[in-house]
Amino acid sequence: MAALRSFLKKRSSVLCNGGAVRHRLFSAQVSQPIPDSPSFAQRIGNLPKDLPATQIKTQVSQLIGRTPIVYLNKVTEGCGAFIAVKQEMFQPTASIKDRPALSMINDAEEKGLITPGETTLIEPTSGNMGISMAFMAAMKGYKMVLTMPSYTSLERRVCMRCFGADLILTDPTKGMGGTVKKAYDLLESTPNAFMLQQFSNPANTKVHFETTGPEIWEDTNGQVDIFVMGIGSGGTVSGVGQYLKSKNPNVQIYGVEPAESNVLNGGKPGPHSITGNGVGFKPDILDMDMMERVIEVRSEDAVNMARQLALKEGLMVGISSGANTVAAMELAKKPENKGKLIVTVHASFGERYLSSVLFQDLRQEAENMQPVAVD
């Protein structure tokens, strides 16, 4: 221990002395400002649109898209088909909703419907879309107000507040219907307010037709046979489905909804744990005609699969991603699908669900851990 303390003391002295030198040099530079020098923002604005000598992006929104696809290997035991999953956790805010958030805001700006610094954006959300919208609003300079059911995870609320959004929680028993109603009430009472309306905005579907669908087609070399996706706003399954069908009419498209809130299969809305899916009504942009059917997945099965994906595949994902995987495996086990390529999506990163039912046992275990003695 004495030798270790001596080493650390010498190391600290070197670092401190070096830090002092760097501080003096840096301070000298700062004390002599260059007259009329342009700000960083001005320099960025003056950059040419294409910089062939560098791959540096000029803004974070340019990082959206081009996410990887990976095969599942261990949880697929007993499946006759191959399952590949597009990992949307690699988006800037770790969810697929970055795509439509960017698309809808850009579309509204191009149409002259909203203006940074003047317009207040209001939107109902179950979480991930709200985070993505708050992220885009912060980057572009909009005030953002979000309504959401109170059952959404604490992590999602913190993420939204991190980007400066105002949150209004609604009665969980009213589901997304109550959240949407509250958003419309705020829209009517707030000056210069605008709602992007993710459930009816064609730009939501368009971005998946123009980006997500082509990415899947290209990464699979056009070999995708089946695409399966959970239904929230319906933008992803509709946009991707329409694109894949345009390339190959024989590609089969399946939706996914919670068994406890199977509205799209003629059932009634109800409470469930698959956050982001099963909004309790049929969204306007949802294209049901191109789908073979909507697969029902129980919340318990979705949660268990999400846990297995982390333990067996090294993929820490959210509950809706677990539901998508359950549905994909159901299709992969059918004899008629043997040898086919099924593609689905892991829509968000699992760290966003630490306070949810997904990790409640592990959270309690971690909270109860005690330190061990160290000699």
From Swiss-Prot:
Catalytic reaction(s) noted: hydrogen cyanide + L-cysteine = 3-cyano-L-alanine + hydrogen sulfide + H(+)
GO molecular function, one term: L-3-cyanoalanine synthase activity
EC category name: lyase
Location(s), subcellular: Mitochondrion
Keyword Transferase attributed: yes
Residue sites binding pyridoxal 5'-phosphate per the record: 128, 232-236, 320
Tissue expression notes: Expressed in leaves, flowers and fruits.
UniProt KW keywords: Amino-acid biosynthesis, Cysteine biosynthesis, Lyase, Mitochondrion, Pyridoxal phosphate, Transferase, Transit peptide
InterPro entries for the chain: Cys_synth (IPR005856), Cys_Synth/Cystath_Beta-Synth (IPR050214), CysK (IPR005859), P-phosphate_BS (IPR001216), TrpB-like_PALP (IPR001926), TrpB-like_PALP_sf (IPR036052)
Pfam families, sorted: PALP
Chief localization: mitochondrion
Matches recorded under SUPFAM superfamilies: Tryptophan synthase beta subunit-like PLP-dependent enzymes
One GO term describing the cellular component: mitochondrion
PTM-bearing positions, type N6-(pyridoxal phosphate)lysine: 97
GO BP field: cysteine biosynthetic process from serine; fruit ripening, climacteric
Induction description: Up-regulated by ethylene treatment and wounding.
Function statement: Probably involved in the detoxification of cyanide that arises from ethylene biosynthesis in ripening fruits. Has only background level of in vitro cysteine synthase activity.
PANTHER family: CYSTATHIONINE BETA-SYNTHASE
Family classification: Belongs to the cysteine synthase/cystathionine beta-synthase family.
Annotated protein name in UniProt: L-3-cyanoalanine synthase 2, mitochondrial
Gene name, Swiss-Prot/TrEMBL: CAS2
